[in-house]
């Protein structure tokens, strides 16, 4: 078995060939209802087929949120596997949004579920949380590296409830977010390993300018930036917050695309309204 190219390399290639845009896929009960679909596994499969038809091979990354599939039981998980296989068949990177976080042995099992050939999902990347300590995620990060995958850890989220915890200061004066950013950078820059960053960061697109210090601490880590569109952020916000790091950013939107459904043509149009600005945003990282 050969190890795939690192996720960071594959993302960079697709971002240039297609667009750096990441399409979130959150088939909530509300969205299924708005599309006129039943809130069951059959409606879920219909929803996913329409999204996949509309997206084709236009995006670099898709990010299905596993909870919206898990709530339909084993049939929902089967739909999730089918969706990920379909996107992988057209070369699109699959980023499974699970945000798992537990002790080391449990995290190792989670990593075996999502990463690597023969795993349940064979994801190219996944999201995690580090509330039990970054050390509990070391085997997860190593599994990701060995699989050519990436692990995105929540560092600064866009939901207001997260601020009080993420910006709390420890005895060394650093905030929780700053300490986590330092730890991710140290892992990525550990001597004797491939230079491609394995540990990425989830950084909300709606964050204030005061978070630029956290971004600087992350070094060359890839930055997954949910919050474009329905949550209020636009590409001008990305330009402001991530100036100088455009090539590291994975611009992400979900509802602002999916709410255009169920018509496939309307979904394509909504998607294109994000693809072109994402290309233009990334282009600012290259010298003219």
From Swiss-Prot:
Keywords per UniProt: Decarboxylase, Lyase, Pyrimidine biosynthesis
Family: Belongs to the OMP decarboxylase family. Type 2 subfamily.
Keyword Nucleotide-binding: no
Catalysed reaction, written as an equation: orotidine 5'-phosphate + H(+) = UMP + CO2
Pathway(s) per entry: Pyrimidine metabolism; UMP biosynthesis via de novo pathway; UMP from orotate: step 2/2
GO molecular function, one term: orotidine-5'-phosphate decarboxylase activity
Organism: Myxococcus xanthus (strain DK1622)
This protein's name: Orotidine 5'-phosphate decarboxylase
